[in-house]
Amino acid sequence: MVRFKQTSEVLKIMRNIEQIRNIGITAHVDHGKTTLSDSLLSAAGLLSEKIAGQALALDYLDVEQKRQMTVKAANASLYHEYKGKPYLINLIDTPGHVDFQSKTIRALRVIDGAIVVVDAVEGVMTQTEMYLRVALEERVRPVLFINKIDRLIKELRSPNEIQQRLVQIVKDVNTLIATYADKEFQKAWLLDPMKGQAFGSARDRWGLTIPLVQQKGIKFSDIVDVYTKGKEAVAELQKAAPLHEAILDMVVKYVPNPRDAQRYRIPKIWHGDLNHEAVKYMMEADPNGPLVMLVNDIRVDPHAGLVATGRIYSGTLRAGEEVWLVNARVPQRVLQVSLYMGPYRELADEITAGNIAAALALEKARSGETVVAMKYKDSMTPFEKLRMITESVVTVAIEPKNPQQLTKLVDALYKLHLEDPSLIVKINEETGEYLLSGVGTLHIEIALTLLKDLYGLEVVASPPVIVYRETVRESSQVFEGKSPNKHNKFYISVAPLNEETLRLMSEGIIVEDMDARERAKILREQAGWDADEARRIMAIDENLNMLVDMTTGVQYLREIKDTVIQGFRLAMKEGPLAMEPVRGVKVVLHDAVVHEDPAHRGPAQIFPAVRNAIFAGFLTAKPTILEPILKLDIRTPMEYIGNISTVITKKRGKLIEVQQMETSARVIAEIPVSESFDIADMLRNVTAGKAIWGQEFSRWAPVPESMLMDLVSKIRTRKGLKPEPPKLEDFLSP
C-alpha cells in the first residue's frame, strides 16, 4: 500500500479554500459506500489499486472487516486534479445500518456535499431516504452515484430497460429533494442526469456520467457487452472510465467550496446573534479570524488518548494554542493537530478554516462541542444540537466473566460512550448491574465485540430488553410536595404536552438554550400555548419534558432555581410507574414556600419535595407506558404480500401502505420494537428469501390498555422492585 503519497500537496492545497470540498458518502446498508471509498483512496495513492474494491480500507476496525459493514464514520483527505487544477477532497465514509445512524448524522453537520449511493437494483431504500432528509435539513447538497450497474445488467440485460431504471432512480431522489430541501434550494439542487450524475460499479471500479459517455463515445450497449466478454473487457472499461474520475469530477463541479457553503449553512446550524463578530469570519471561512470549530467525532486512541475531530468554520487550529470549550466551559491546550487518512493521522503544525481536523488533548470535548478562541470565552453561542432520529431503546445487563476486571469494564464502557454517545451506560441502583443501551440489537452486539477486540474483555450479557417511556394522558390537580425537614413546600401539577409542542422540540425548533421571547412566540403561534405560560419555561430536558414556573413573588425561589430544575430532571429520568424515563410531560410549578436559611434548603431537601409533588400529580393524570415503534420498508414480489401482512399482524403491527411498483410491491408497516427481534428470520421464511427491507425508529406509542399493568409489573420485577407500582399516598405530604 502506498501511504500518504501526496500529503505535502494536501497540506498546501488546504490553504486555498476554493480548492477544498468537504463530502460524505451516505446510503442504505450494503449499497456500496465503503467499496466506493476504496476506489477513491486508490486513485489518491492511499490504497493499492489491486485490492481497491475489496479492501474496505475505511472500515479499519476488525469487526467492520469481518462483518463487511461500516460501524464508525472514517475520514480521509484526498488529492484530486480536475481540469489541470488540484483539489483537496475531505471525505467521510459513514455507516448505512440504522443502528449506527447517529454517526452518520454527526458527520452530516461538518460536510457540504453528500454522495448518495443507491443500489441500481434495490433503488431508494429507507436509510437512503432518511439520510437524504437529514442532509437536506442541514443544507448539505446531494449528488448521486447509482451503483451496482453490473448487477442490474445481469438482471435486466436490455440497454433500454437499464436506462429506464436509472431515470426512475433519479426521479425518486428528486422527489425527496423537492420534499425536504429548503425552498431556496429545491430547484437548484434537483439532479439532472444530462449534467453529470454518476453511475457505475464500485466493485469493478468504473464510473460514468452522461457528459463522459458523450465525451468518450461509449454507448449503454457497449457496457452491457462488456459483461458478456469477461474480466479482460471489464479491466478495459476500468481504464476507459475510471470510477474516481466520474465521482470526484462530479464532486468538484457540484459541491460548493467551504466558504460558499458556510454563507448559507451558518444561519441554519448556528443560532446565535447574527451581529456577533464571529459571524462575519464564519461566513467567509476566514483563516485569519478567531478560531471557531465544531467537534463531530471523538475517538479514544490507545496511544494518544482522546482525539477530537471536527470542522473549522473560522480561524486556524494550531498545536500548542489554548482554546475554550463552550459547552464544557473549560480552557484546554491543543497538543497536536492532524488530518485523517482512514485509521491514520498525519501531523500538521496547523489546519485552516474550511477543513476537517483532528486535535489531541481536548480531554473535556464531547461530540457536538463548540471550540473557540479564548477571546470568545464569554460571548460565543454553541452550535445547534444535532437532532437524532433514532433512540437507544434496547438494553442488556452486562458483567465481566472475570470479576477482577470490573474496573477495566467500567473504563471501557466510558470510552465506548465517548466515541458513540448513543451507547448509554447506567448502573441499576437496586441490583448493581451495568446496563448498556443501544439503538438496536446489532448496535449492542458490535459494542460487546469491541469490548473483546479493543479492550480484551470477556463479558456476560443478559438477553436484550426494551427501554420504554412513561407519560400522562390527562391534566392533574395541584399537589403539595414537602421537604423532609418540613420547611420547604412546592405546589405542582402535571399535564401532557400537545403533539405540536413535541414536534417543535423533537425537530430542535424549541430548545432550552434559545431566546425566551422567540421561544414564547413560536409556542403561541404554532402550538397554541397561553402567552403567560409560554414566557415562563424554566427547563426542557432531553426526553421532551418541560418545567414551567407560574409562581409570583416567591421569596428565595431564585436562589434555589438550579436545584429545583435539577430535581425536575431527576424526576423525569425515572418515572413512578416503572422507573422508566418520562416523555412529553409539562410540569407546572404554581407556588412555593422556601426557607430563608440556605442550610435548610439544600438539594437533600428540595429534590424529594419536587419529586413527590410531580409523582403525585403523575399518578392521578391517567399515566401510561409508551413503547418504541419501528417503521419497516419492505420490497417484495407481489405474491408474498399476504404472507407479509400475516407476519405484521402477528407482531402487533399494522400495514401503513402498499405500493405497486414495476415488478414488485413496496410495503410500509409498523411494529413494536419488542416484537422485532426475530422479524428478519420470519420475513425471509415467508418470502423464500426474496424480500429486501430496511427499518428505522418511527415514534413512541401507548401500549394497549390490556397489556399495561402486566408490562409495568414485568419491568419492575426485572429491576428488582416490587411488582406493584407505588400508590398516590406514597407521595402525599403527611
Curated annotation (Swiss-Prot):
The modification Diphthamide is found at residue 600. It holds the Pfam family EFG_C. It is found in: Cytoplasm. GTP binds at residues 27-34, 93-97, 147-150. GO terms for cellular component: cytosol; ribonucleoprotein complex. Gene3D superfamilies: 3.30.230.10, 3.30.70.240, Elongation Factor G (Translational Gtpase), domain 3 (3.30.70.870), P-loop containing nucleotide triphosphate hydrolases (3.40.50.300), Translation factors (2.40.30.10). HAMAP family: EF_G_EF_2_A. This is Elongation factor 2. The lineage of its organism: Archaea, Thermoproteota, Thermoprotei, Desulfurococcales, Desulfurococcaceae.
